């Protein structure tokens, strides 16, 4: 039986340079939050908590699951849209 990491390794991601499909509107807003839930809940690990309290986002490898969209919807600090056609996650099952 395969581990989830092995299955995720088979997926590919086509980066749309200069056009990320997720954007943190105000990075300073995240420093005010005591819990940075996106850094824990994102299955792809796209969010990182920095030592200064800020949250950085790298969308390369995003699974487009929408978890961050749900977690951050109350704050309204996240801009999330589907990637353009031909870009984003390319699932490979096998």
UniProtKB/Swiss-Prot annotation:
Keywords, ordered alphabetically: Electron transport, Iron, Iron-sulfur, Metal-binding, Nitrogen fixation, Repeat, Transport
One Pfam family it belongs to: Fer4_ETF_QO
Lineage top rank: taxon: Bacteria
GO molecular function annotation: iron ion binding; iron-sulfur cluster binding
Q: Which InterPro entries match?
A: 4Fe4S_Fe-S-bd, ETF-QO/FixX_C, Fd_FixX
Q: For this chain's UniProt record, which GO biological process terms are given?
A: nitrogen fixation
Q: State if Transcription regulation is listed as a keyword.
A: no
Domain spans labelled 4Fe-4S ferredoxin-type: 20-52, 53-83
Q: Which Gene3D superfamilies match?
A: 3.30.70.20
Return the similarity comment: To ferredoxins from P.putida and C.tartarivorum, ferredoxin I from A.vinelandii, ferredoxin II from D.desulfuricans.
**PANTHER family the UniProt entry points to:** FERREDOXIN-LIKE, FERREDOXIN-LIKE PROTEIN YDIT
Q: What does this protein do?
A: Could be a 3Fe-4S cluster-containing protein.
Protein name, per record:
Ferredoxin-like protein
Q: Which organism is it from?
A: Azotobacter vinelandii
> Gene behind this chain?
fixX
């Amino acid at each position: 039986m395969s581990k989830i990491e092995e299955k995720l390794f088979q997926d590919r991601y086509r980066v749309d340079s200069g056009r990320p499909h997720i954007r943190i509107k105000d990075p300073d807003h995240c420093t005010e939050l005591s819990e940075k839930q996106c850094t824990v809940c994102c299955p792809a690990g796209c969010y990182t908590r920095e030592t200064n309290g800020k949250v950085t986002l790298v969308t390369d490898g995003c699974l487009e699951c929408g978890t961050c969209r749900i977690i951050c919807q109350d704050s309204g600090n996240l801009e999330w849209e589907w990637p353009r056609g031909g870009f984003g996650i390319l699932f490979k099952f096998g």
